[in-house]
Amino acid sequence: VPGYEWSSWQKGYGDVHATVDLSTLRLAAWQDRTALVLCDLASPADHQPVEISPRRILSRQVGLARELGYDPRAGSELEFFLLSESYDEAEARDFGEPRTSGWYVEDYHTMPATRQEPVIGAIRRAMDASGVPVESSKGEWGPGQHEINLRYTDVLEMSDRHVLYKHAAKEIAWAQGLGLTFMAKWHEEHA
């Protein structure tokens, strides 16, 4: 199977060279005096790009689309579940039943998401300050479920924004004593 020369259950993950992509350098506004930069991966043997790297695969596809005259762009609706306890607290009780930050459907309501605004607002503001424009946020269908929508852009830039957004959202929730998961179906009764 292609790609398994790089990693497998037997080999683990090998060493790679990380080449900084300065176009991704930006403020990590959810941390004090911190910036973040993403890297492309290269083989330590010949310094050639690691072709199975997700960022490299997407870059190749964008290049092919542009050769055909297209400019691939994307917007993202990224949903998550906000938990009313941190993962440390959940571990202390042996990861019993997770407790969501909400207890009923908030989709299409005008006020209920207000209860989680301290964390949702912090995520929105951190993203905007980090160069990741937020278009909207709202409560969703499941208990504790929310979405934050990122403004459309070039697809490679959008994938980079996903990396920042997901790290920031989890860290901001943790800093407020909450858990946050992007799992599509974290519980058998909730999706």
Q: What residues fall within each predicted segment?
A:
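Glycine-rich, acidic/polar active-site loops that bind/position phosphate-bearing ligands
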Residues: 1-191
